């Protein structure tokens, strides 16, 4: 289970019920497709497993994608490090950095690898460029590409057309699913299945979140979104995640919130600014600013109740060093640090909430990611913006094309 505890004054239900109705209308309209992936993506599991079942030679899955085509998968790879049931390793190329490109290629062999080229539009310049570099690096002929590459894209996109031309297997992203909301589509399901993760449990966790919100009417997401969107002087939300397993999730959270909620509304610029930290490490860097700096931040703590294989700190006594943590489970120490920091911030009258996962597995990862997608959609409704476009990003893309053309 996932528990979300709010340490701030909550609103009367009649104040926020209209926003719940608008989210319901959004679901019923069918215009925003991510809501329905919990059901429609089930068929992808069988299709993915059938495709990969005879490819025993594949030891590496190399995903090439940007933004929404990679952040979510990176989050799942980090969170599900204990869940993998086979030996396929997942590599991710998500930047036009020669350093990371060359470093990744040093670790893989062509004959042991399957490359997933992911671009919703089918024309992402970074993805197309990396695709070409892979062809050149491995000295592949065009007729060989179908053995080593799989495309994930929109139906009838340029990438799909090229896949048809080259005989490359294509998986499709629904047209009404935006990139940063696509983790439960082929973008996430296909690589998870290829690597041996439990994609069905991921969808089941997401569906449980859907039912808690829409059927059981749990209101934590509504309360949290309303509080954070109406506190105009505290428009920075800090996600303080207490486990290194949340490193990729933090990146996904930043992209989801920033690209969805940072918008122009007429002459006004509005939105929540996301900051993501890892505890307990960042207690020794950013915490001072939160505690004593401007009160322009809200803080969400993310923790795991039970962690597997956590060692116990030995009962070793020194003459000068303290023994406070002796015989304490290392994960219990981490959670104690989380709780201590949280209550210190509450004492400073900051708006704080905590999300606690029972454990870290595919089901809980699915619930958590769907929770944040619903939270983002709810904030968008409350802010009166289009949550699902990114006009500011498109401007830079046009300038880049002009630079390259010149």
Curated annotation (Swiss-Prot):
Transmembrane segments: none annotated. GO terms for cellular component: cytosol. Its EC number is 5.3.1.9. The keyword Cell wall biogenesis/degradation does not apply. GO terms for molecular function: carbohydrate derivative binding; glucose-6-phosphate isomerase activity; monosaccharide binding. It catalyses: alpha-D-glucose 6-phosphate = beta-D-fructose 6-phosphate. Pathway: Carbohydrate biosynthesis; gluconeogenesis; Carbohydrate degradation; glycolysis; D-glyceraldehyde 3-phosphate and glycerone phosphate from D-glucose: step 2/4. InterPro entries: G6P_Isomerase, Phosphoglucose_isomerase_CS, SIS_dom_sf, SIS_PGI_1, SIS_PGI_2. The active site is at residues 259, 284, 397. This is Glucose-6-phosphate isomerase. It comes from Campylobacter jejuni subsp. jejuni serotype O:2 (strain ATCC 700819 / NCTC 11168). The gene is pgi.
């Amino acid at each position: 289970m996932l528990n979300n505890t709010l340490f701030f004054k909550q609103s009367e239900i009649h104040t926020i019920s209209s926003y719940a109705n608008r989210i319901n209308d959004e679901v019923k309209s069918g215009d925003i497709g991510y809501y329905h992936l919990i059901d429609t993506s089930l068929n992808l599991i069988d299709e993915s497993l059938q495709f990969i079942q005879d490819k025993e030679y594949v030891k590496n899955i190399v995903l090439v994608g940007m933004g929404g085509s990679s952040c979510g998968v990176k989050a799942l790879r980090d969170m599900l490090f204990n869940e993998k049931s086979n030996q396929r390793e997942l590599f991710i190329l998500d930047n036009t950095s020669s350093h990371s490109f060359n470093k990744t290629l040093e670790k893989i062999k062509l004959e042991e690898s399957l490359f997933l080229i992911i671009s919703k539009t089918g024309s992402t310049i970074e993805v197309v460029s990396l695709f070409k570099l892979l062809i050149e690096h491995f000295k592949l002929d065009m007729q060989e590409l179908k053995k080593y590459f799989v495309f994930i894209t929109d139906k009838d996109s340029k990438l799909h057309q090229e896949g048809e031309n080259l005989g490359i297997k294509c998986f499709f992203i629904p047209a009404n699913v935006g990139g940063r909301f696509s983790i439960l589509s082929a973008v996430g399901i296909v690589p998870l299945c290829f690597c041996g993760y439990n994609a069905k449990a991921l969808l089941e966790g997401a569906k449980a979140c859907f039912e808690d919100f829409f059927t059981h009417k749990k209101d934590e997401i509504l309360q949290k979104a309303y509080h954070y969107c109406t506190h105009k002087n505290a428009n920075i939300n800090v996600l303080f995640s207490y486990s290194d397993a949340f490193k990729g999730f933090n990146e996904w959270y930043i992209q989801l919130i920033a690209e969805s909620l940072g918008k122009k509304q007429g002459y006004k610029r509005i939105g929540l600014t996301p900051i993501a930290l890892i505890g307990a490490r960042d207690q020794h860097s950013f915490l001072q600013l939160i505690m004593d700096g401007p009160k322009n931040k809200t803080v969400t703590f993310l923790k795991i109740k039970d962690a597997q294989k956590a060692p116990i700190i030995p009962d070793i006594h020194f003459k000068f060093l303290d023994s406070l943590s002796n015989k304490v489970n290392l994960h219990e120490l981490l959670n104690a640090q989380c709780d201590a920091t949280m209550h210190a911030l509450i004492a400073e009258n900051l708006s704080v909430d905590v999300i606690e996962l029972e454990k870290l597995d595919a089901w809980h990862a699915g619930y958590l990611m769907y929770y944040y997608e619903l939270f983002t959609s709810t904030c968008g409704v409350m802010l009166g913006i289009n949550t699902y476009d990114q006009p500011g990003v498109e401007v830079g893309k046009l300038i880049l094309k002009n630079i390259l053309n010149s």
